[in-house]
């Protein structure tokens, strides 16, 4: 399931992050790529340290407070978050994200990209997600997040004007299978709609029972 989460950060948080990144030190993005992804990765990433840790926590906290993100992703652990910068000519060719990341070998079930530059401020730089028989390009509004399965091949097109700033990260979900997460999301959406329209009905209780039992069956 691919979906968008709009307006993730508070305006003050967004302004602070953009201001800090404007003056911060970036390093070669190849340093955090797998050996095969290094062949196609041409970008820069915020240097590890106190600033990176601070900004990472701000983004994590915002995502964990977001109801749509919680319901659709079922996060166990948000991990490996990076702040990436693409200048003119930079891109990230077709690649697959590593299945396990970091020293704790967190699983990457779900990937996300938080757009920190408005579309009008740069050209190119679309995030393209490849499917079995098609592909789709994404270039979201400032402060929006694109969430997609980590199992997909994807790429970032070359930036031809301006600068593209994003935060990218991964999630180990309580439910590793994408189709199972989608079933739970659909049931949760239906349950909430019933509650808004009719309150706590027998139908609401049946869906609640199914969600709870499926989580017992699928969660890990």
Swiss-Prot record:
EC number: 1.14.11.-
Domain Fe2OG dioxygenase residues, every copy: 77-173
Positions of 2-oxoglutarate binding: 164
GO molecular function: 2-oxoglutarate-dependent dioxygenase activity; iron ion binding; L-ascorbic acid binding
GO BP, sorted A to Z: DNA damage response; intracellular iron ion homeostasis
UniProt keyword Metal-binding, yes or no: yes
Residues the entry annotates as binding Fe cation: 95, 97, 154
Catalytic class of the enzyme: oxidoreductase
InterPro entries hit by this protein: Oxoglu/Fe-dep_dioxygenase_dom, PKHD_hydroxylase, Pro_4_hyd_alph, Pro_4_hyd_alph_FE2OG_OXY
Cofactor: Fe(2+); L-ascorbate
HAMAP family reported for this sequence: Hydroxyl_YbiX
Protein name per its UniProtKB record: PKHD-type hydroxylase PCC7424_1929
């Amino acid at each position: 399931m691919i979906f968008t989460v709009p307006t993730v950060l508070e305006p003050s948080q967004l302004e602070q992050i953009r201001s800090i990144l404007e003056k911060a030190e970036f390093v070669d993005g190849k340093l955090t790529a797998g050996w095969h992804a290094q062949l196609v990765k041409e970008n820069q990433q915020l240097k590890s340290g106190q600033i990176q840790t601070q900004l990472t926590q701000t983004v994590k906290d915002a995502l964990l407070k977001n109801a749509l993100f919680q319901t659709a992703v079922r996060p166990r652990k948000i991990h490996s978050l990076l702040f990436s910068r693409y200048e003119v000519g930079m891109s990230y060719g077709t690649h697959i994200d590593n299945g396990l990341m970091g020293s704790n070998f967190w699983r990457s079930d779900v990937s996300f990209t938080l757009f920190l530059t408005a579309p009008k401020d740069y050209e190119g730089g679309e995030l393209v997600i490849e499917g079995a028989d098609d592909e789709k390009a994404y270039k979201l509004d400032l402060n929006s997040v694109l969430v997609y399965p980590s199992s997909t091949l994807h790429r970032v097109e070359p930036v031809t004007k301006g600068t593209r700033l994003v935060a990218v990260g991964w999630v180990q979900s309580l439910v590793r299978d994408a189709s199972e997460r989608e079933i739970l999301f659909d049931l949760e959406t239906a349950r909430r709609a019933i509650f808004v329209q009719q309150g706590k009905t027998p139908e609401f209780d049946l869906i609640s029972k199914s969600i709870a039992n499926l989580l017992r069956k699928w969660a890990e």
